[in-house]
């Protein structure tokens, strides 16, 4: 099951867990209130997993590719790691399925505080369009992930501040309705 918690404000290595002291865990229900959805799947059979196919069909995830993030496999590794960790939003949902390795997605809550979500093999997550977030590897320095999209992939990230986008306003309205 996914593990999430509120982060400390430390400037130490971004790949460390950065848990508050005392810890403040975050439940799956709390993440859902932010529009973040999670599934646990069998990553060893992703190529012909009926559960993954069902999710893809229901949510119209019709395009996918696989990315491996590690020094040996990803061109311009250092530049990409910095780019992934820059706080940003997308105009479309971000859907990631961890096939191997591990890392962290950080998302902003309603009060603009960081929540860190630990992702490992078999974890699939959807971050809603308009949510400020970032990604980093953990101390293993390796993740292999499936990227899924509704329609043609759009790779554009809009670094904060990006509040002028209509999708950001829609996301804030969604949060307000959640109370």
UniProtKB/Swiss-Prot annotation:
Pfam family, one: ARD
Top-level lineage group: Eukaryota
Gene that this sequence comes from: ADI1
Organism, as annotated: Monodelphis domestica
Catalytic activity reported: 1,2-dihydroxy-5-(methylsulfanyl)pent-1-en-3-one + O2 = 4-methylsulfanyl-2-oxobutanoate + formate + 2 H(+); 1,2-dihydroxy-5-(methylsulfanyl)pent-1-en-3-one + O2 = 3-(methylsulfanyl)propanoate + CO + formate + 2 H(+)
Protein's name in the database: Acireductone dioxygenase
Function: Catalyzes 2 different reactions between oxygen and the acireductone 1,2-dihydroxy-3-keto-5-methylthiopentene (DHK-MTPene) depending upon the metal bound in the active site. Fe-containing acireductone dioxygenase (Fe-ARD) produces formate and 2-keto-4-methylthiobutyrate (KMTB), the alpha-ketoacid precursor of methionine in the methionine recycle pathway. Ni-containing acireductone dioxygenase (Ni-ARD) produces methylthiopropionate, carbon monoxide and formate, and does not lie on the methionine recycle pathway. Also down-regulates cell migration mediated by MMP14.
Subunit structure: Monomer. Interacts with MMP14.
Cellular component GO terms, alphabetical: cytoplasm; nucleus; plasma membrane
Annotated residues for binding of Ni(2+): 88, 90, 94, 133
Cofactor-binding details, from the entry: Binds either 1 Fe or Ni cation per monomer. Iron-binding promotes an acireductone dioxygenase reaction producing 2-keto-4-methylthiobutyrate, while nickel-binding promotes an acireductone dioxygenase reaction producing 3-(methylsulfanyl)propanoate.
Bilayer topology annotation: Peripheral membrane protein
């Amino acid at each position: 099951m996914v593990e999430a918690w509120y982060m400390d404000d430390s400037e130490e290595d971004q790949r460390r867990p950065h848990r508050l002291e005392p810890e403040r865990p975050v439940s799956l229900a709390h993440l859902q209130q932010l529009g973040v959805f999670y599934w646990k799947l069998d990553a060893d059979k992703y190529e012909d997993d009926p559960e993954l196919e069902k999710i893809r069909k229901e949510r119209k995830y019709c395009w996918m590719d696989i990315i491996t993030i590690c020094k040996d496999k990803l061109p311009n590794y250092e530049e990409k790691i910095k780019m992934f960790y820059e706080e940003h939003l997308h105009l479309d949902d971000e859907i990631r399925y961890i096939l191997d390795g591990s890392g962290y997605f950080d998302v902003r809550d309603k009060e603009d505080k960081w929540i860190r979500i630990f992702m490992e093999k078999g974890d699939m997550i959807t971050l809603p369009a308009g949510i400020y977030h970032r990604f980093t590897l953990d101390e293993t320095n390796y993740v292999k992930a499936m990227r899924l999209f509704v329609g043609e992939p759009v790779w554009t990230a809009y670094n904060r501040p990006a509040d002028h986008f209509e999708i950001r306003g829609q996301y804030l309205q969604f949060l307000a309705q959640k109370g």
